[in-house]
Amino acid sequence: MLKSIRAALAVSVITLTALGASSAFAQPLKVVASFTIIGDFAKNVGGDRIDLTTIVGPDGDAHVYEPSPADAVAMAKADIVLVNGLHFEGFLQRLVDASATKASIAVLTKGVTPINFKPEFAEADAAEGAETDGGKTVTDPHAFQSIANAKIYVKNIADAFCTADAAGCDSYKANAAAYTQKLDALEGEVQAAIQSIPQEKRVVITSHDAFGYFEKAYGLTFLAPEGVSTESEPSAADVAKLVSQIKQDKAAAIFVENITNPRLIEQIASETGIKVGGTLYSDALSQPDGPASTYIDLMHNNIAQIKGAILGS
């Protein structure tokens, strides 16, 4: 892959040289977002002042993504790269090195209070490169699943854009404030939806443990056969243990995720007798014509699927 990336970069070097330093931001700010959720935040903050490229596209899995030569070219041309951090993007450092980008890299989880991943899969996830605190505790990188954290991402994006393009700062701040108001309203909707579900029914199953921040923020319990990363499947013993826990906790619904193979969830559904309730969007947005093409639509879809499967509506 490195040879093809370097070849693609060589083709773009003349363009980069021609751009030079003159009128650095007379043209839109060149922004690279690591995956679609961050890309959506960037669009809402940047508007028409940015030229956005998103690395991991709709329904893509950033845990296992392999970057392309085109990704390296985009990185090399970028003014700003927006990333999640907390080891969410396993491909990131390789892509930075291969592209030799000089872009500013904004880590959007700056200011977020990280939570630790559930201990069942901590050892396996640590072996796969997830961030640890020195022991087997693993930091959950899916901070965007809390709307309160999404607001932090948005603020960090606005700050990064203001630093790179001072002339557009008022616009970025106004856009961020307007979008944050929409997130405030969204959070109220999610809280109301969860409150309508009886406490004893607030247990659901998903493919991998991507919803820890949602669980902590809104009081819904998620059980998952896979850990914080999708890089490896759980063992038969892990699945058997989860099936036992599902029966013990009387889980009310089970869901596939848009980024994972549904086979394992279908197996668990068969063994527990719980009907698959639909698809939740975890680490990526849907295609533009899908039900979760924006972050707000993602949250609307997920809460509607969860509430509908549990309450039968």
Name each model-derived stretch:
Residues M1-S12:
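Bacterial N-terminal signal peptides that target proteins for export
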Residues S12-T15, A304:
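N-terminal non-cleavable signal-anchor helices
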Residues L2, A24-F25:
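Short, aromatic- and cysteine-enriched interfacial helices/patches
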Residues T15-A24:
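C-terminal segment of classical bacterial N-terminal signal peptides
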Residues F25-S313:
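Extracytoplasmic metal-acquisition and chelation regions
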